[in-house]
Amino acid sequence: MSTSEAGAAATVIPIDDVARDHGKAPAVATAPPPPAAAAAVPAAATTTAPRKTGVPFFRRADRGSRCVALLDFVLRVAAFGPALAAAIATGTSDETLSVFTQFFQFHARFDDFPALLFFMVANAIAAGYLVLSLPFSAVIVLRPQAIGLRHLLLVCDMIIAALLTAAAAAAAAIVDLAHSGNLRANWVPICMQFHGFCQRTSGAVVGSFLAVLVLLFLVILAAFAIRKR
């Protein structure tokens, strides 16, 4: 080995060995700081992100449709009461009139008149339909764009309105005959004797016609809503 090679070998000293000899820990390499542009991107994104706010139930886009659907729901509840009351009043309108003794009696029964029997059944069907249609009406309140349900309810409303109109008209004729009689046929009025029967059937006819009016308004309302959509 020459003198120059020995000098070169002597000058190579590891840094770790020197730091260990002096009692110092080796330097830890640190990552360079991120660029200013990269650090500013998340801050800008957080400042420009839109704030989440709750969407109101009656939005501006479909506020009118929701109001019409809500009115439809309320009217169905309103029509249910008169229809059910008419069916109950007719079904409980039987009356017995005793003359002289309890063995000689006259009866006034609603099922003796086919028109009144049809009237009671029609009102019971209408009341049941109005209850069953409430969930569908509630779905339309939540989803005004459900045109198929609107068409279905419109057709069913028209059928029930026609059925209830026929039943109420037939019952009204019988009630008028019970109040006034018919002189040409020698049919005497019976309401002078059977007060309870006539009062119940008369009230039932009035309630049924109220339900018919509400159903007709429902048909007009549904047609207007479908045409608007």
Curated annotation (Swiss-Prot):
Q: Does the keyword Transmembrane helix apply?
A: yes
Q: Where are the transmembrane segments?
A: 68-88, 116-136, 158-178, 206-226
Tell me what topology the record assigns in the membrane: Multi-pass membrane protein
Main location (coarse class): membrane
Cytoplasmic-side stretches of the chain, per the record, are: 1-67, 137-157, 227-229
Cell location: Cell membrane
Extracellular topological domain residue ranges: 89-115, 179-205
| Lineage top rank: taxon | Eukaryota
Spell out the InterPro entries in the cross-references: CASP/CASPL, CASP_dom, CASPL
What does this protein's UniProt record list under function? Regulates membrane-cell wall junctions and localized cell wall deposition. Required for establishment of the Casparian strip membrane domain (CSD) and the subsequent formation of Casparian strips, a cell wall modification of the root endodermis that determines an apoplastic barrier between the intraorganismal apoplasm and the extraorganismal apoplasm and prevents lateral diffusion.
PANTHER family documented for this protein: CASP-LIKE PROTEIN (PTHR36488:SF11), CASP-LIKE PROTEIN 1U1 (PTHR36488)
Report quaternary structure and partners.
Homodimer and heterodimers.
Recorded protein name is Casparian strip membrane protein 1
Organism of provenance: Sorghum bicolor (Sorghum)
What broad taxonomic lineage does this protein's source fall under?
Eukaryota, Viridiplantae, Streptophyta, Embryophyta, Tracheophyta
